[in-house]
Each structure stands twice: as structure tokens, then as C-alpha cells.
Amino acid sequence: MRFFLPAFLLFATLNTAGQELFPYSEPASNMPAKSMSLKMGAMLGQGVHGSGVDQRYTPEVMFGLNKKWMVHGAVTLSNMYENFFYYESARVYAKYRFLSNDDVHKHFRMAAFATAAYSRNHLQHNELNLLGDHSGVQAGIIATQLWNKFALSGTASIIEVLDEARNNKPQEYAFQSLNYSLSTGYLLLPRVYKDYNQTNLNIYAELLGGQNLDWEYEKYYLDLAPSLQLIFKSTSKLSVGYRFQPKSDIYRNMKNSWMISYEYIFLNALRKKSSK
């Protein structure tokens, strides 16, 4: 049977649902159950603290526990706040898919997620995130709709930064923000799906934003992030993207950046081997 493989579908197998793998955000879908994935990501850009290139590298491991639960663990190495590379942060992420309405070549899914992060950096700006800059917790909701070759996904979450500066009076920084994203993905190639060995070319556009909830002087940022993605033999993907700021009133550490990442999945890595 000939059918289209959606652009954002990675790691497809004969018995698992497709995933919409946006480079800058998570979909509501999970990776295949009982599988493990290894990922290396890099962010490169011109920071505001120096003339060199700021860099952050993120090795990450992901586990598909079952069809509803998946967990991530990651650390970051960076020179963004110092003039040398150092171990910067660690974080854990868990996602629970609580709704699935699946049909032929389309589905609607929703998931809840939570993140906890520790960072060695101290608060220096009011762009709140848990990607290496800050220590804190985050919780949110994801909704993803798939139609054949096109996917649309939205995320909303609350970040609470846990930093010793919270005790300073008067307040010097924001500590709570509403973060959101709107992501789209589309399959460019192949036009006709034949087998799992075909290389897929996917194109994405993502809107990424944050609104500080407890700070009146620097309130928001809004970024756009177009990207391209290649999927090889349904088991690995290479993503390249550029994130830039159309509008913001926040003094940020980095306004524009390049992203490159490579990920490989080990299907059925967590399944128990049957004894003979």
C-alpha cells in the first residue's frame, strides 16, 4: 500500500504512531515505546557580553517508557556567561500524553509536561528559560494536530525561576513567566512514500515567545525560528535552524542564534530480551 509519510514523522515503525519532531519545541506525541534516543544539540550566536561567538552544547538522552510516558535528561556546556567553557546546567523532563484521537493520516493529541533544571548561572537578564540560563521548574500543556503532510502544534507553560535573588528587596528580576510556542511542519520530500530507507526533507516554522508575569519593566519577547530537517532511514535526524527576534522589550543575552542537532533512536532498546 502506497501512502504519504508526514514531514515531521520521524522514527516511524510498522507498529508505532508517527511523531511530529519540531526542532525548537516538543509535540504532544511521544517517541516509540521501549525505545531510547541520543541527541547532541548546539546553539551558536553573537552574545551581548563579548565579541566572540557564544556557544552552548546539549547532550541529551530520551526514553519512551510506554505509549503515554517519555522522559528526558540533559546537561549543557557553554561559554555564554564566561570566557571559557564550563559545565553549565542539568535538567530532567517528563511528558504524559493524556489524549489521542487517531485516524488515517491524521490525529489530534494532547500532553502535559514538567521540567526541573539546575544552572550554575546567576540571574543576569529577564528572558526566563530552563535551557541552561536559569534554575527552576516548568509545567505546561501541548496540543498537536496532524493532517497528512502538515502538522500544527501549540504549547503553553509557566516557568518559575528558583534563584537566590528572589530574596532581594527591592525585586531586581522577573521570576515567573508564561512561555508559549506555535509550530508548523511540512513534508517536502519524498513526494511519494515507498519504504523506510527513504530520506525525508522537512521544513518548519516556529513562533516562540515569553511573557513575564511579575516584572513591569521588561515584559516580553517574540522569536521566529525557521528550520530544515533531514531524516535518514527512519532512525536518525539532522536539524538546522535560525532563531531571530522580531520584537522584544527585554535586554537579552542573545537575540539571534543558529541551532544544529543530530539525534539517533534505538528502537526497542528497553524491551526485555526473551529467554530461550
Where are these regions (language model features)?
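Structural signature of outer-membrane beta-barrel channels/translocons
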Residues: 62-64, 95-101, 142-148, 183-191, ...
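Outer-membrane pore/translocation modules
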Residues: 83-177
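Outer-membrane beta-barrel "beta-signal"
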Residues: 91-94, 182, 254-276
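Short loop/turn motifs that connect adjacent beta-strands in outer-membrane beta-barrel proteins
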Residues: 26-33, 68, 84, 100-109, ...
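Residues that define the transmembrane beta-barrel architecture of outer-membrane proteins
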Residues: 32, 53-57, 85-90, 131-137, ...
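Transmembrane beta-strands of outer-membrane beta-barrel pores
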Residues: 42-46, 75-81, 98, 114-120, ...
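Membrane-embedded beta-strand positions of outer-membrane beta-barrel proteins
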Residues: 38-42, 73, 94, 110-114, ...
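Short glycine/proline- and aromatic-enriched beta-strand/turn motifs that initiate or cap beta-hairpins
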Residues: 18-61, 117-123
